[in-house]
């Protein structure tokens, strides 16, 4: 039995190449935000959480310093906890330029976070899509392994069927040969019984002849007695001697005839029995041994086949359970992809609202130097991340359509 299963695996490579092409370029501000906060929309207590706000502002200020190629304190390079963050801010106070940049990031950190949210959502969507592609590849790999197991079981089943067919053919040939042997043995039995019947017939004829001679001897003896009663003593003696000689000759004849017949019958019977025993014992013993050895081998192969079938069933059950688990994981990943697409749509809506807010800020008059500095810093941040944000929006939209097509 031949089974066939094929799947074009180049689709996985093409999807990975597409994901690599859609990956946005690295951005310092986006990286800093990602390390600290995962979702800007979840910052409901953002104004109250000063530590989080300070940590984000320090990370964004460091990105500003790097972009402008401005030296900054070494304490701001390794921000791991609140103590290191405080040490960084204490050194930023020592320089007006450092402090102005930090303070501007502190005031506009939420807006900057939302500006980079699109590219971050694009990264998450691409990561989810990569997970879906990996899960699909694993699923098809499991399906290939499952199909190979099915083909192996099919080949094993064909081998078992062929073996049983050969065994049944051998049994049929053995029974036919035993039937022929039985017919031959019956013919030997009939021949031997026919010969025995002939020997018994000869013995019966010899006995009949001996009885006739005995009757003749009796009549002769009776005649001799009558003649003796009429003859003299000398004649009686001669007649008696002749009767004794005739009786002795007849006895010898009977003994010889009986011995010849008995020996001939025993010899023939012994030969017949020898032929019967040799033919029946040898033939039947050989066939019984062949059948017994064949049945023993058959039982051994059958036990081995049962063990193999049990092992294959166990492997098949494990494969099915693994495939079910992979399908469940694949379903969860697809759900995550859908959620990422919906989040991307919501993010686009929030970006529109953010643009409207920026427009409204542009329409207001500048009332203080502090507001002007904050406004300039926000414009610089928007200029730095604006290009990547636009690219992120376009790629996010494309990825949303791609994920929906994959689902």
Swiss-Prot record:
This is Nuclear fusion protein KAR5. The gene is KAR5. Belongs to the KAR5 family. Disulfide bonds: none annotated. The chain crosses the membrane at residues 383-403. It holds the Pfam family Tht1. It comes from Yarrowia lipolytica (strain CLIB 122 / E 150). Residues 404-407 are cytoplasmic. Residues 30-382 are lumenal. InterPro entries: Nuclear_fusion_Kar5. It is found in: Endoplasmic reticulum membrane; Nucleus membrane. It is a single-pass membrane protein. PANTHER family: NUCLEAR FUSION PROTEIN KAR5. The keyword Iron does not apply.
């Amino acid at each position: 039995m031949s089974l066939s299963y094929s799947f074009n695996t180049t689709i996985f490579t093409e999807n990975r190449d597409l994901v690599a092409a859609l990956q946005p370029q690295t951005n310092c501000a986006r990286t800093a935000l990602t390390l600290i906060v995962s979702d800007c929309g979840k910052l409901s207590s953002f104004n109250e959480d000063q530590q989080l706000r300070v940590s984000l502002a320090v990370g964004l200020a460091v990105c500003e310093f790097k972009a402008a190629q401005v030296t900054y304190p070494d304490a701001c390079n390794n921000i791991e906890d609140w103590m290191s963050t405080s040490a960084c801010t204490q050194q930023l106070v020592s320089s007006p330029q450092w402090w102005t940049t930090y303070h501007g990031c502190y005031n506009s950190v939420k807006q900057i976070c939302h500006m980079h949210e699109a590219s971050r959502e694009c990264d998450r969507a691409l990561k989810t899509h990569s997970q879906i592609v990996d899960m699909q590849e694993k699923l098809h790999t499991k399906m290939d392994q499952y199909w190979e197991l099915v083909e192996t079981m099919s080949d094993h089943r064909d081998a078992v069927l062929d073996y049983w067919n050969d065994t049944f053919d051998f049994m049929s040939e053995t029974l036919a040969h035993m039937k022929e042997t039985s017919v031959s043995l019956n013919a030997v039995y009939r021949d031997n019984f026919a010969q025995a019947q002939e020997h018994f017939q000869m013995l019966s004829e010899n006995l009949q002849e001996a009885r006739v001679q005995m009757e003749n001897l009796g009549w002769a003896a009776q005649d001799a007695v009558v003649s003796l009663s009429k003859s003299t003593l000398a004649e009686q003696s001669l007649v008696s001697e002749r009767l004794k000689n005739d009786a002795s000759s007849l006895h010898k004849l009977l003994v010889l005839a009986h011995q010849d017949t008995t020996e001939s019958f025993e010899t023939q019977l012994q030969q017949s029995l020898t032929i019967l025993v040799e033919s029946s014992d040898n033939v039947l013993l050989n066939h019984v041994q062949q059948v017994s050895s064949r049945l023993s081998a058959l039982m051994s192969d059958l036990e081995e086949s049962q063990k193999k079938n049990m092992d294959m069933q166990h492997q098949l059950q494990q494969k099915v359970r693994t495939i079910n688990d992979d399908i469940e994981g694949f379903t969860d990943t697809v759900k995550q992809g859908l959620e990422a697409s919906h989040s991307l749509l919501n993010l686009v809506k929030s970006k529109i609202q953010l643009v409207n807010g920026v427009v409204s800020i542009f329409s207001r008059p500048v009332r203080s130097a502090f507001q002007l500095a904050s406004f300039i810093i926000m414009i610089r941040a928007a200029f730095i991340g604006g290009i990547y944000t636009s690219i992120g929006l376009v790629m996010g939209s494309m990825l949303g359509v791609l994920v929906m097509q994959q689902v």
